[in-house]
Structures are given as structure tokens and as C-alpha cells.
Amino acid sequence: QGAQCTAGPCCWPCKFLKEGTICRRARGDDLDDYCNGISADCPRNPYY
């Protein structure tokens, strides 16, 4: 009850992780990707 999500890099446990939580670490010249607090998906940074 009250679940926001069931799976995803920004979902744990059944709640969206708060905005600013790192969900994908930077690789090479890329930047870290962060949860947005409203989705279970990990949005890509605008510079990928």
C-alpha cells in the first residue's frame, strides 16, 4: 500500500529515491546521473 514503484534504479523499497541520489556513476568523460525524485528510471544527464 502506498507503493510508488516496483523496480528501477531510482526505486527502493517501493518508493522513489529522493532527487539528487546518484543512480549511475560517471564513466570516462561523462557525468554522474541522478534520480529526479518523481520516477523509478535513471534519467541521463544532458551531456551524455
From Swiss-Prot:
Signal peptide: none annotated. Residues 1-48 form the Disintegrin domain. InterPro entries: Disintegrin_dom (IPR001762), Disintegrin_dom_sf (IPR036436). One of its GO terms (molecular function) is toxin activity. Expressed by the venom gland. It is found in: Secreted. Keywords: Cell adhesion impairing toxin, Disulfide bond, Hemostasis impairing toxin, Platelet aggregation inhibiting toxin, Pyrrolidone carboxylic acid, Secreted, Toxin. The modification Pyrrolidone carboxylic acid is found at Q1. A motif (Cell attachment site) lies at residues 27-29. It holds the Pfam family Disintegrin. GO terms for cellular component: extracellular region. Disulfide bonds join C5-C11, C10-C35, C23-C42. Belongs to the venom metalloproteinase (M12B) family. P-II subfamily. P-IIa sub-subfamily. Monomer (disintegrin). Inhibit human platelet aggregation induced by ADP, collagen, thrombin or the thromboxane analog U46619 in platelet suspension with IC(50) values of 66-267 nM. Acts by inhibiting fibrinogen interaction with platelet receptors GPIIb/GPIIIa (ITGA2B/ITGB3). It also inhibits angiogenesis in vivo and in vitro by blocking integrin alpha-V/beta-3 (ITGAV/ITGB3) of endothelial cells and by inducing apoptosis. Negative results: does not inhibit the binding of specific monoclonal antibodies to alpha-2/beta-1 (ITGA2/ITGB1), alpha-3/beta-1 (ITGA3/ITGB1), and alpha-5/beta-1 (ITGA5/ITGB1) integrins. This is Disintegrin accutin. It comes from Deinagkistrodon acutus.
